Amino acid sequence: MKETAFIIDRDLAPYVNCIYTDENFDVNGHTNIPLYADGYPGIMFQQTENGFFLLPKNKKLSQLFLFGQTLEPVSLDIKGAYKFVVIQLYPFASKYLLGIDPKVLNDDCYDLLEINYINVEKYRQSLIQTNNLDTQVKIISDLMRALIRTHKISENDKIEKAISIIIQNNGQIKIKELLDKIYMTERTLERNFMAYIGLTPKQFSKIIQFQSSINKLTQSTYNSLLDIGYDSGFSDQSHFIRTFKSYTGQTPSYYLNHLSNR
């Protein structure tokens, strides 16, 4: 997937982190796209003859769906040519869009076409009638506005601030230090995180810490995996390897070798 330079509309900027696109014209191809924990849910619109399947569940996905937090290693499996656009959301955004317990979205996808209080099919029809990325993003943006207006979930500034602090610190911040910055008790923080993100603060911090380490793996500024582990805040190499494997199903060295052989 490649990130696309795109100016997000001002009213949706608090909800959208970035936009990704990808396409493959090989009708005989077989593509598997690993999805690792990164702390961000998103909306995907996909076009393919044979469908997208979520592995290991082997679940056929809707043409227009919202995916939640990724905790276990999962992947998208696609046979033939395909094209998709992803609106990557901030961690709390799925709560504002769907008004449901975000925990039910963990390691899963929500079929937006099943919504019965908005005519989502109208948006899907508009999406399939254009190949222009700008137009597709505009259509999905209009759908997001309709969902936000419908649910009218109260914004939680303190949780949004806590998320921002955790991300800025690459997950390397103690919960007590975080509480001091947002003036909240640990119990209240955990309850609000579960309500708005579907994760505990510690789970979310661990995911951001892992994502920081996987980004460092692709850089050439480190001499060893041990250096990456320490710089990412892991207590020792075994801690780093254990955490990395829990999110990817692979050791860091295997992941790196596989990456270089692509």
Predicted regions and their residues:
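Alpha-helical bundle regulatory/interaction domains
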Residues: 1-160, 166-170, 175-176, 182-186, ...
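HTH DNA-binding helix-turn interface
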Residues: 192-201, 234, 244-251
